[in-house]
Protein backbone atom coordinates (compact mmCIF):
# COMPACT_ATOMS: atom_id res chain seq x y z
CA UNK A 1 0.00 0.00 0.00
CA UNK A 2 1.13 3.55 -0.70
CA UNK A 3 1.89 5.83 2.25
CA UNK A 4 1.90 9.50 1.20
CA UNK A 5 4.31 12.01 2.71
CA UNK A 6 3.63 15.54 3.95
CA UNK A 7 0.39 17.08 2.71
CA UNK A 8 -0.17 14.49 -0.01
CA UNK A 9 -3.27 12.32 -0.32
CA UNK A 10 -3.81 9.01 -2.17
CA UNK A 11 -7.17 8.91 -3.98
CA UNK A 12 -9.13 6.19 -5.79
CA UNK A 13 -10.95 8.01 -8.60
CA UNK A 14 -14.52 6.99 -9.40
CA UNK A 15 -14.77 6.27 -13.11
CA UNK A 16 -18.14 7.32 -14.48
CA UNK A 17 -19.21 6.16 -17.89
CA UNK A 18 -20.88 8.98 -19.83
CA UNK A 19 -23.01 8.52 -22.94
CA UNK A 20 -23.68 11.12 -25.60
CA UNK A 21 -25.99 10.15 -28.43
CA UNK A 22 -25.40 6.45 -27.79
CA UNK A 23 -21.60 6.79 -27.76
CA UNK A 24 -19.61 6.14 -24.60
CA UNK A 25 -17.19 8.90 -23.61
CA UNK A 26 -14.10 7.48 -21.91
CA UNK A 27 -13.22 8.79 -18.46
CA UNK A 28 -14.71 12.07 -17.33
CA UNK A 29 -14.84 13.74 -20.75
CA UNK A 30 -14.58 17.47 -20.26
CA UNK A 31 -15.50 17.66 -16.57
CA UNK A 32 -13.51 20.22 -14.56
CA UNK A 33 -13.61 18.04 -11.44
CA UNK A 34 -13.83 14.38 -10.50
CA UNK A 35 -15.04 12.49 -7.46
CA UNK A 36 -12.63 10.24 -5.56
CA UNK A 37 -12.34 8.30 -2.32
CA UNK A 38 -9.51 9.10 0.09
CA UNK A 39 -7.43 5.94 0.51
CA UNK A 40 -4.50 7.31 2.55
CA UNK A 41 -3.30 10.66 3.90
CA UNK A 42 0.13 12.01 4.77
CA UNK A 43 1.07 13.04 8.30
CA UNK A 44 0.62 16.76 7.52
CA UNK A 45 2.97 19.70 7.22
CA UNK A 46 5.14 21.52 9.74
CA UNK A 47 4.83 25.22 10.50
CA UNK A 48 7.87 27.46 10.89
CA UNK A 49 7.63 26.79 14.64
CA UNK A 50 7.89 23.05 14.01
CA UNK A 51 4.27 22.28 14.92
CA UNK A 52 2.62 19.53 12.88
CA UNK A 53 -0.62 20.58 11.16
CA UNK A 54 -2.66 17.52 10.17
CA UNK A 55 -4.69 17.32 6.97
CA UNK A 56 -8.37 18.24 6.71
CA UNK A 57 -9.44 15.05 4.93
CA UNK A 58 -9.64 11.53 6.37
CA UNK A 59 -9.46 8.04 4.92
CA UNK A 60 -12.79 6.85 3.54
CA UNK A 61 -14.16 10.32 2.73
CA UNK A 62 -15.42 11.17 -0.76
CA UNK A 63 -13.86 14.33 -2.18
CA UNK A 64 -14.07 16.56 -5.22
CA UNK A 65 -10.67 17.08 -6.86
CA UNK A 66 -9.44 19.18 -9.79
CA UNK A 67 -9.53 17.15 -13.01
CA UNK A 68 -5.88 17.58 -14.03
CA UNK A 69 -4.37 17.54 -10.54
CA UNK A 70 -1.89 15.05 -9.21
CA UNK A 71 0.10 12.12 -10.51
CA UNK A 72 -1.34 8.74 -11.47
CA UNK A 73 0.43 5.87 -9.71
CA UNK A 74 -0.05 2.11 -9.68
CA UNK A 75 0.14 -0.25 -6.73
CA UNK A 76 -0.14 -3.74 -8.14
CA UNK A 77 -3.16 -3.79 -10.45
CA UNK A 78 -4.81 -0.77 -8.78
CA UNK A 79 -4.48 2.78 -10.15
CA UNK A 80 -4.46 5.70 -7.72
CA UNK A 81 -4.09 9.46 -7.90
CA UNK A 82 -1.52 11.15 -5.65
CA UNK A 83 -2.42 14.81 -5.01
CA UNK A 84 -1.52 17.64 -2.68
CA UNK A 85 -4.31 18.54 -0.25
CA UNK A 86 -4.51 21.96 -1.94
CA UNK A 87 -5.93 20.25 -5.07
CA UNK A 88 -8.91 18.88 -3.13
CA UNK A 89 -11.80 21.30 -3.52
CA UNK A 90 -14.44 19.85 -1.19
CA UNK A 91 -15.61 16.88 0.86
CA UNK A 92 -18.76 15.29 -0.59
CA UNK A 93 -21.29 14.53 2.15
Swiss-Prot record:
Main location: cytoplasm
Compartments (UniProt record): Cytoplasm
Keywords: Chaperone, Cytoplasm
Entries under CDD domains matching the protein: cpn10
Gene symbol of the encoding locus: groES
Pfam families in alphabetical order: Cpn10 (PF00166)
SUPFAM superfamilies: GroES-like (SSF50129)
Protein known as: Co-chaperonin GroES
Cellular component, GO annotation: cytoplasm
One GO term of the biological process aspect: chaperone cofactor-dependent protein refolding
Biological role stated in the UniProt entry: Together with the chaperonin GroEL, plays an essential role in assisting protein folding. The GroEL-GroES system forms a nano-cage that allows encapsulation of the non-native substrate proteins and provides a physical environment optimized to promote and accelerate protein folding. GroES binds to the apical surface of the GroEL ring, thereby capping the opening of the GroEL channel.
Segment forming the signal sequence: none
Molecular-function GO terms, alphabetical: ATP binding; metal ion binding; protein folding chaperone; protein-folding chaperone binding; unfolded protein binding
Record-linked InterPro entries: Chaperonin_GroES (IPR020818), Chaperonin_GroES_sf (IPR037124), Chaprnonin_Cpn10_CS (IPR018369), GroES-like_sf (IPR011032)
Subunit structure: Heptamer of 7 subunits arranged in a ring. Interacts with the chaperonin GroEL.
Family to which the UniProt record says this protein belongs: Belongs to the GroES chaperonin family.
Amino acid sequence: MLKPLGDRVVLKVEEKEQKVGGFVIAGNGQAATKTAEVVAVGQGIRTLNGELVSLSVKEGEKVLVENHAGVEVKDGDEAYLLVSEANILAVVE
